[in-house]
A protein has these predicted regions:
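Divalent-metal (often Zn2+) His-rich catalytic cores of metallo-beta-lactamase-fold enzymes
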Residues: 198-251, 267-277
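Metallo-beta-lactamase
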Residues: 36, 56-68, 95-148, 154-224
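Metal-dependent catalytic neighborhoods of phosphoester/phosphodiester hydrolases
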Residues: 70-80, 97-98
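Conserved beta-strand hairpin/beta-sheet module of binuclear metal-dependent hydrolase folds
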Residues: 1-50, 54-56, 159-171
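Residue-level marker for buried hydrophobic side chains located in beta-strands
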Residues: 30-32, 61, 85, 166-168, ...
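C-terminal regulatory/interaction regions
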Residues: 243-333
Length: 333
């Protein structure tokens, strides 16, 4: 008996924001992406409704280590020390010692971090099962293929159940609220890479899944159409961010004092940092305005706010901006 069940963990009292995947087979139960620690009460209740407790789980599979996907893992280990935690090798060190992960999240979320994500605890090294991609996991009567799918994050993997035809792709497929008409890119810093992301799309589609399981939110049953639409929007958003940055750079350069207009200011120059912050702020405002208008036209204001809360348009701009600057640095070497 193999069964796949989406568990809505009701993030910040918002249904259809984060879905953990419960995988059951004979004498085995696993979760893919349990969510943040702040939603553990709901996760426990969801498990209870399916006749399970945390102590009944055998494994947790992490697509990537962002807190909305993996933040609860350390606390779950305290409740069930026998859990096996599957995670990519680039993410594993930050599961064992989440201090840098928490510091990075704090820079993005500030005082909201505890409310949004709760407490992120370390995972003991002995519980970690290190993945690279290419492995086949046996979970009871179920077998899952692991594939490395970077782009959204350098430590991102996807899990493929060929018998059921389901691909669990984390954030590689963006945000689509339960079969909705719009797919929202989620591109937070620090390591968005569209070249790698395109390769990950190919990795997913070449396996010909019947459906995609998105952490945000649940299943979608036309994988090829979803990926084609999402890829087009992802690249278009990249171009929108790039144009916004170029326009802001031109405008801020014209209105800045001469000291800020040095041809090649030092990266540590306070004046250079000030002008860069002005450019980012101006470009972000344009990006958010344009993307919000498109989103609202497709799903309406109320659902647009739900999408934006789940992915964060400001975070998406920051991730794209960082990717653009990286690409520019490579092209000028």
């Amino acid at each position: 008996m193999n069964k796949i069940t989406p568990l809505d963990v009701n993030w910040c009292n918002r249904p259809k924001s984060i879905a953990a995947a419960l995988l059951q087979s004979e004498n085995h139960a696993a979760l893919i992406d349990p969510g943040p620690e702040s939603t553990l009460t709901t996760l426990r209740e969801q498990l209870r409704q399916h006749g399970l407790s945390v102590s009944d789980l055998n494994a947790i599979l992490i697509t990537h280590i962002h807190l909305d996907h993996a933040g609860a893992t350390g606390k779950l280990i305290r409740e069930n020390p026998n859990l096996k935690i599957y995670v990519h090798s680039k993410g594993a060190p930050h599961m064992a010692d989440p201090s840098k992960l928490i510091a990075s999240a704090s820079r993005l979320w500030g005082d909201q971090l505890p409310t949004l994500f709760g407490e992120t605890l370390p995972v003991p090294q002995e519980n970690l099962q290190i993945l690279e991609g290419g492995e086949t996991l046996t979970l009871g009567q179920r077998k899952l293929e692991v594939a490395y799918t970077p782009g959204h994050a350098s430590h991102h993997v996807s899990y493929f159940d060929s018998d059921e035809g389901v691909a669990f792709i984390g954030d590689t497929g963006g945000v689509r609220i339960t079969d909705g008409p719009y797919i929202l890119p989620a591109t937070p810093p620090p390591d968005v890479d569209l070249t790698l992301w395109d390769k990950s799309f190919h990795t997913i589609l070449e396996r010909k899944p019947k459906s995609l399981f998105l952490t945000h939110f649940a299943e979608y049953n036309d994988p090829e159409a979803h990926i084609i639409e999402f890829r087009e929007r992802l690249h278009r958003w990249f171009n929108t961010a790039e144009k916004s940055l170029a326009a802001a750079t031109k405008f801020v350069g014209k209105t800045s004092p001469p000291i800020m207009q040095k041809p090649e200011p030092s990266a540590t120059d306070p004046a250079a940092k000030e002008i860069e912050a002005k450019i980012e702020t101006a470009a972000m405002a344009v990006f958010i305005r344009e993307c919000s208008a498109e989103l609202e036209s497709k799903v309406g204001p109320a659902e647009a706010e739900h999408y934006a809360f789940t992915a964060g348009l400001d975070l998406s701009f920051r991730g794209l901006s960082r990717a653009i600057r990286k690409r520019q640095e490579i092209n000028t070497r």
